[in-house]
Amino acid sequence: TTLPQEILHIDTPVEYFRYFFTNEVIQYIVGQTNLYSIQCRPNKSVGVSHSEIEQFIGTSLFMSIIQLPATRHYWNSYLGHPAVNEVMSCNRWEEIKRFIHFCDNSNSVPASSPNHDKLFKIRPLLDKLRERLLLVPKEEFLAVDEQIIPTKCRSSLKQYNPKKPHKWGFKAFVLSGVS
């Protein structure tokens, strides 16, 4: 199968990211973040904007690649990096981090309920990303494998697989084509 033209013209990592994190997805995150901030502090909304969420995600991705011992070091005059400290102030970044949300907490189901979803907090975001992933056509020959995403955190979702190089982590199923 051939890829759609919109996918064939993706040349940069930013374009690839924007293919999955559409304006609709970013706007959804803006709405849920502002809603959560009002639920926490009725008199003072965080008032996050579309561009601030994009900047927050971008700086967070940058911080995951260029790692420093502490988050505040990115704004330090000696250790800091302009890709972070010129984009947003440290206090604003931490405020957005505190309130960023992907779902409406008022719709949560108790853990004892049979309808409880362990991924409730990110389920709407996962569903929106899945919609975009399903638009990418599948190749004729595919391989399915399970992959362990390594982590040292405590989570009921963490699994152990002695056959994998990283034994502990989150299990994900991977669909790979020949290309």
Enumerate the predicted regions with their spans.
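N-terminal initiation segments
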Residues: T1-S179
